[in-house]
């Protein structure tokens, strides 16, 4: 059985780490874990997030692939149900819209 988030030192928990050190100190997996909130009996939220990151078939070190994933593709991961998949898709859409605004400002 994996270690529970509550059993980790506070400095290793995503919420506490963000609060204490800022968002820039978190890994991509930790940021995704905050979005999906909870894990399963078998996997922590960070573990689920790491599985999501493994869906990157381009193997480039960026997160653009998340924007192309469908709700159904997120749900292929055990522990990612419809609600978590929709949350991830919503955040991806927000990121897309922020990027559009930023690109517009640069012109």
Kindly label every feature range from the protein language model.
Residues 1-73:
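Long, highly charged, low-complexity intrinsically disordered interaction regions
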Residues 23-24, 93-97:
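Short, compositionally biased low-complexity segments
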Residues 40, 92-94, 106:
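Alpha-helix termini
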Residues 44, 92, 100-101:
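Alpha-helix boundary/capping detector
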Residues 77:
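Acidic-histidine catalytic/liganding microenvironments
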Residues 84-95:
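Structured, non-catalytic alpha/beta "coupling" segments that mediate domain-domain communication
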Residues 99-107:
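Long, charged amphipathic helices and adjacent flexible linkers at domain junctions
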């Amino acid at each position: 059985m994996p270690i529970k988030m509550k059993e980790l030192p506070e400095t290793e928990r995503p919420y506490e780490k963000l609060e204490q050190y800022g968002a820039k100190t978190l890994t991509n997996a930790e940021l995704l874990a905050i979005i999906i909130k909870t894990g399963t009996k078998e996997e922590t939220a960070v573990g689920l997030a790491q599985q999501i990151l493994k869906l990157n078939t381009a193997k480039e070190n960026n997160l653009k692939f998340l924007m192309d994933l469908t709700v159904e593709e997120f749900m292929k991961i055990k522990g990612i149900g419809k609600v978590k998949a929709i949350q991830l898709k919503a955040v991806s859409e927000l990121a897309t819209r922020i990027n559009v605004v930023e690109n517009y400002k640069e012109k």
